[in-house]
Amino acid sequence: MLDPLYPLFPIFAFLGFVLAILPLPWHLQAWNSGTCFFMMWTALGCLNQFINSVAWADDAMNKAPVWCEISIRILMGASVGIPASSLCIIRRLYYIAKVRAVSKTRAEKMRAILVDALICVLFPLVYIALQYIVQGHRFNILENIGCYPAVTNTPVTYVVSYVWPVLLGLISATYGVMALLQFNKHRLQFSQFLHTHSTLSASRYLRLMALALTEMMCTMPLGIFVIVLNSKTENIQPWVSLAVTHYGFGRIDQVPAIVWRSQHLIVVCNELTRWCAPVSAFIFFFYFGFAEEARRNYAAAWRRVCRALGLPERVPSLPTTKKPFSSSDNKGSGFAEKFAAKAKGFSNFNVKDFTSEFTSKAHDFTSKAKQYTLPRPMPQTLSSSGFSSSDSTRFGSSVDGKELPSPTTKEFSSPIPIHLSGMQTLASFDSNKDLPSPPAYDIEAQYGPYNIDNRVSYHIADTGVRASYPMGVAYSSDSEHRRIVPHHSTVPHHSTADEPASPALPDTPSSCSSSATFSTLQSRDFIVLPSSADVTRRDSGSSAGGVASTSRPTRAGPPRLPSLSQLFGISSMRGQEGDVEAQGEEMAADVDVSEMVLDTLAPASIIAATTTAGAPATTTPDRGEPDVPTSPRTHRASV
């Protein structure tokens, strides 16, 4: 009859042998004699059960009588060797918890090992020898189990065989309770004591305690169960003499599985006996197989095996990316450490010192602006009398020693500060990244005549296509059709004594705010601004009491904006007809204002057209929407 647990039990028995013997080398180095004896007895018990379960898996023949003589004695020794090892472990832990001096010299260590060897080795050997007193014949062979001791059921048997595992468990329990009490009583001294011993830590101490207590809780119930079971399954025979007990000692009983499995209590007793060693091995590995020292030794053993087989010892690890702001390649790591140190003592934290230190370190992490590779046009300067018909201002040119930035066909990567009406904002001009790179355009801004509503309009011409745009309106271009579209809100014109106030348009969201201050302009926006010549012409026309022109512009526009002086808070211009000196100052001031607008609003496209006094007013018919690029391009303002 085949074993119903075959091959499950042989596999578990062999795994228990490997798991129990694997940590033995480094425990020998640490002089843990009790733990080493526990591993030895557990490994022997697992190996013995593995061989028996494989050799007699489906029969009860006497195949190896010599092995059976050895096997039954291993089984006898393991039945008390494992509990005795647990006793040595917990006894050693008790002396440590009592904060007594653990052996330091070699002689003291050898004395401690000798005591443990007497308990874990000599006592099991004596126990094995005493089993001859109660041994009725050589051995039994149980099908599916293998070799099994044959002892008589007499009162002497309970004293010689069955009581010792229970007694060892009781002694271990006593030491365990005392160790826990001492540990709780001397916690401070215990922690200081552990620091002086490199081979023992608090984690290992607690794991050893748990192992011993677990083994004790498994051994004592099992020993009691065996005593009760033997007393009930068979009648207890009186002890007569040793000769009566050994009558027919050379007999070997071969018991088929169908016979011994017919009684449920005997099945339970036999299964518990053979599963005891594998379970002890797995319990030990659970407590010590995943510790840090175990992992280190596993790695060392793996390297030795790979070296012997000629295999690579370690698999190359994948390249790891450096952490940002690491201490090896970052200048700001010291700042992070100082910040952490200050955070610990927050009561002495000085905000002023922190902010100054942060300011000094912030420049280390700023990125440099990209270099613009677009070739710039040749520098052209302004004439001293203002803008003439032949003068033009281009981005990339020099105006009174100031160089204007060149437009780029790609996005602007760095923020650009804009100062408007006393406020400073940051605009990141990245709205052109989805646009292609068209060729540069020359956009002309021409002066348009006054209309009957006293509004000023300007003409913007591009490759022959001209259109008129009212002054003071913010425009933006459509990214798809490349057409200029006016916004629906303007800066309100503040009325003067001789001019009526213009009705303000409703305040709707756009890139140009309807309040007195501008919001951040995008790079595709521009606003048509008046010039000093317009102010001079308007003032001179008002003083003469006449209207310069009655022709209506090609497009109706929103109310007129004030002059640059009123718009940017500069003192009002003194424009009087015939006053050449005052007019020259006006032109100089207006040129400065134009430079300020170009500097502060760059790279936004700002078309500010100026004209000289006396220039003829022209009106160009509207031929449709001009094709104006959405990003800043080269501009030319002329009359």
Swiss-Prot record:
Q: Name one GO cellular component term.
A: plasma membrane
Give the residue spans that cross the bilayer.
Answer: 8-28, 37-57, 70-90, 113-133, 163-183, 209-229, 272-292
Q: Does the keyword Chaperone feature in the UniProt annotation? A: no
GO BP annotations, alphabetical order: pheromone-dependent signal transduction involved in conjugation with cellular fusion
Its chief place of residence is: membrane
The family annotation for this protein states: Belongs to the G-protein coupled receptor 4 family.
Q: What is this protein called?
A: Pheromone B alpha 1 receptor
